From Swiss-Prot:
Pathway of action: Sulfur metabolism; hydrogen sulfide biosynthesis; sulfite from sulfate: step 2/3
Pfam families in the cross-refs: APS_kinase
Superkingdom of this protein's organism: Bacteria
Single GO MF descriptor: ATP binding
Record-linked InterPro entries: APS_kinase, P-loop_NTPase, Sulf_AdTrans/APS_kinase
Top enzyme class: transferase
Keywords: ATP-binding, Kinase, Nucleotide-binding, Phosphoprotein, Transferase
Gene name of this polypeptide: cysC
GO cellular component terms listed in the entry, alphabetical order: cytoplasm
Protein name as catalogued: Adenylyl-sulfate kinase
Length: 181
Protein backbone atom coordinates (compact mmCIF):
# COMPACT_ATOMS: atom_id res chain seq x y z
CA UNK A 1 0.00 0.00 0.00
CA UNK A 2 1.35 3.41 -0.94
CA UNK A 3 0.82 6.26 1.49
CA UNK A 4 -0.08 9.72 0.32
CA UNK A 5 1.91 12.70 1.48
CA UNK A 6 -0.37 13.65 4.36
CA UNK A 7 -1.00 10.16 5.74
CA UNK A 8 0.75 9.26 8.98
CA UNK A 9 3.47 6.65 8.61
CA UNK A 10 4.06 4.01 11.27
CA UNK A 11 6.99 5.17 13.38
CA UNK A 12 6.97 8.60 11.78
CA UNK A 13 5.97 11.61 13.78
CA UNK A 14 4.49 14.82 12.53
CA UNK A 15 3.86 18.35 13.73
CA UNK A 16 0.47 20.02 13.46
CA UNK A 17 0.99 23.75 14.06
CA UNK A 18 -2.12 25.70 15.09
CA UNK A 19 -1.67 29.45 14.56
CA UNK A 20 -4.13 32.30 15.02
CA UNK A 21 -5.14 35.15 17.27
CA UNK A 22 -5.61 34.71 21.00
CA UNK A 23 -9.15 33.41 21.50
CA UNK A 24 -9.50 32.02 17.97
CA UNK A 25 -9.75 28.46 19.32
CA UNK A 26 -6.25 27.04 18.83
CA UNK A 27 -5.97 25.43 22.25
CA UNK A 28 -9.59 24.27 22.19
CA UNK A 29 -9.16 22.50 18.84
CA UNK A 30 -5.72 21.14 19.69
CA UNK A 31 -6.98 19.76 23.02
CA UNK A 32 -10.00 18.13 21.37
CA UNK A 33 -7.79 16.62 18.65
CA UNK A 34 -5.34 15.44 21.33
CA UNK A 35 -8.16 13.63 23.17
CA UNK A 36 -9.39 12.00 19.95
CA UNK A 37 -5.94 10.85 18.84
CA UNK A 38 -5.15 9.56 22.33
CA UNK A 39 -8.39 7.54 22.29
CA UNK A 40 -7.26 6.04 18.96
CA UNK A 41 -3.93 4.98 20.44
CA UNK A 42 -1.81 7.59 18.65
CA UNK A 43 1.34 8.75 20.44
CA UNK A 44 0.50 12.45 20.71
CA UNK A 45 1.72 15.44 22.70
CA UNK A 46 0.32 18.95 22.98
CA UNK A 47 2.68 21.91 23.24
CA UNK A 48 0.59 24.88 24.27
CA UNK A 49 2.17 28.27 23.68
CA UNK A 50 1.23 29.61 27.11
CA UNK A 51 2.65 26.54 28.91
CA UNK A 52 5.86 26.63 26.88
CA UNK A 53 6.28 30.35 27.53
CA UNK A 54 5.83 29.73 31.27
CA UNK A 55 8.22 26.75 31.42
CA UNK A 56 10.80 27.10 28.63
CA UNK A 57 10.67 30.76 27.73
CA UNK A 58 10.27 32.41 31.12
CA UNK A 59 11.88 35.81 31.03
CA UNK A 60 11.09 36.49 27.39
CA UNK A 61 9.01 39.55 26.67
CA UNK A 62 6.77 40.31 23.73
CA UNK A 63 9.17 42.05 21.36
CA UNK A 64 9.40 40.56 17.87
CA UNK A 65 12.78 39.04 18.76
CA UNK A 66 11.42 37.43 21.95
CA UNK A 67 8.32 36.12 20.19
CA UNK A 68 10.48 34.63 17.44
CA UNK A 69 12.75 33.02 20.05
CA UNK A 70 9.72 31.48 21.75
CA UNK A 71 8.41 30.07 18.44
CA UNK A 72 11.84 28.64 17.60
CA UNK A 73 12.03 26.95 21.01
CA UNK A 74 8.59 25.42 20.53
CA UNK A 75 9.67 24.23 17.09
CA UNK A 76 12.85 22.69 18.46
CA UNK A 77 10.97 20.66 21.09
CA UNK A 78 8.26 19.69 18.58
CA UNK A 79 10.90 18.48 16.15
CA UNK A 80 12.61 16.33 18.77
CA UNK A 81 9.34 14.66 19.70
CA UNK A 82 8.27 14.16 16.08
CA UNK A 83 11.60 12.54 15.17
CA UNK A 84 10.73 9.87 17.74
CA UNK A 85 7.38 9.03 16.22
CA UNK A 86 5.17 11.40 18.19
CA UNK A 87 2.38 13.42 16.62
CA UNK A 88 2.96 16.88 18.09
CA UNK A 89 0.17 19.43 18.29
CA UNK A 90 1.50 22.97 18.70
CA UNK A 91 -0.96 25.64 19.78
CA UNK A 92 0.81 29.00 19.60
CA UNK A 93 -0.12 32.41 18.24
CA UNK A 94 3.23 32.52 16.37
CA UNK A 95 2.39 35.88 14.82
CA UNK A 96 5.16 36.31 12.25
CA UNK A 97 4.84 34.48 8.92
CA UNK A 98 8.56 34.37 8.14
CA UNK A 99 9.41 32.77 11.49
CA UNK A 100 6.59 30.22 11.12
CA UNK A 101 7.85 29.30 7.63
CA UNK A 102 11.41 29.01 8.91
CA UNK A 103 10.41 26.74 11.81
CA UNK A 104 7.96 24.63 9.81
CA UNK A 105 10.62 24.01 7.15
CA UNK A 106 12.76 22.22 9.76
CA UNK A 107 10.01 19.91 11.04
CA UNK A 108 9.10 16.41 9.88
CA UNK A 109 5.68 16.18 8.21
CA UNK A 110 4.51 19.68 9.19
CA UNK A 111 0.90 20.80 8.83
CA UNK A 112 0.04 24.47 9.31
CA UNK A 113 -3.50 25.05 10.57
CA UNK A 114 -4.81 28.61 10.52
CA UNK A 115 -7.41 28.89 13.28
CA UNK A 116 -9.30 31.96 12.21
CA UNK A 117 -11.93 34.13 13.86
CA UNK A 118 -12.56 37.86 13.35
CA UNK A 119 -11.36 40.37 15.94
CA UNK A 120 -14.92 41.05 17.13
CA UNK A 121 -15.44 37.32 17.80
CA UNK A 122 -12.19 36.81 19.71
CA UNK A 123 -12.97 39.96 21.70
CA UNK A 124 -16.37 38.51 22.67
CA UNK A 125 -14.74 35.21 23.68
CA UNK A 126 -12.13 36.95 25.85
CA UNK A 127 -13.38 36.37 29.40
CA UNK A 128 -10.35 38.19 30.89
CA UNK A 129 -11.06 41.36 28.93
CA UNK A 130 -7.54 41.53 27.50
CA UNK A 131 -8.67 42.66 24.05
CA UNK A 132 -10.73 45.50 25.51
CA UNK A 133 -7.77 46.58 27.62
CA UNK A 134 -5.44 46.35 24.61
CA UNK A 135 -7.87 48.33 22.45
CA UNK A 136 -7.94 50.97 25.19
CA UNK A 137 -4.13 51.15 25.07
CA UNK A 138 -3.64 49.56 28.49
CA UNK A 139 -1.73 46.50 27.21
CA UNK A 140 1.19 47.20 24.87
CA UNK A 141 2.40 44.68 22.27
CA UNK A 142 -0.91 42.82 22.08
CA UNK A 143 -1.06 40.64 18.97
CA UNK A 144 -3.84 41.61 16.62
CA UNK A 145 -4.31 45.01 18.24
CA UNK A 146 -1.05 46.92 18.75
CA UNK A 147 1.28 44.24 17.35
CA UNK A 148 0.77 42.48 14.02
CA UNK A 149 -0.55 39.03 13.34
CA UNK A 150 0.52 37.86 9.90
CA UNK A 151 -2.06 35.33 8.78
CA UNK A 152 -0.80 32.39 6.72
CA UNK A 153 -1.34 32.95 3.01
CA UNK A 154 -1.47 29.24 2.12
CA UNK A 155 -2.08 27.18 5.26
CA UNK A 156 -2.56 23.45 4.89
CA UNK A 157 -5.93 23.84 6.61
CA UNK A 158 -7.96 26.99 7.32
CA UNK A 159 -10.60 26.63 10.05
CA UNK A 160 -13.06 29.48 10.65
CA UNK A 161 -14.07 28.85 14.24
CA UNK A 162 -16.83 31.44 14.09
CA UNK A 163 -18.54 29.24 11.47
CA UNK A 164 -17.86 25.67 12.62
CA UNK A 165 -18.15 23.73 15.87
CA UNK A 166 -15.20 22.20 17.69
CA UNK A 167 -16.49 18.77 16.63
CA UNK A 168 -16.57 19.80 12.97
CA UNK A 169 -13.08 21.26 13.29
CA UNK A 170 -11.78 17.98 14.72
CA UNK A 171 -13.50 16.04 11.90
CA UNK A 172 -11.80 18.25 9.32
CA UNK A 173 -8.44 17.88 11.06
CA UNK A 174 -8.71 14.09 11.27
CA UNK A 175 -9.64 13.85 7.59
CA UNK A 176 -6.85 16.20 6.51
CA UNK A 177 -4.26 14.35 8.59
CA UNK A 178 -5.29 11.00 7.11
CA UNK A 179 -6.88 9.51 10.23
CA UNK A 180 -10.42 9.47 8.83
CA UNK A 181 -13.27 11.22 10.58
Amino acid sequence: MTATLNQPQVGTGRVVWFTGLSGAGKSTLASALHAELTARGVAVELLDGDAVRENLSKGLGFSKQDRDTNVRRIGFVAGLLAKHGVTVLVSAISPYAETRREVLSTLPNPTEVFVDAPLEVVTERDVKGLYLRALAGEIPHFTGVSDPYEAPQNPDLHLRTDRISVEEGVRQLLAHLGYGA
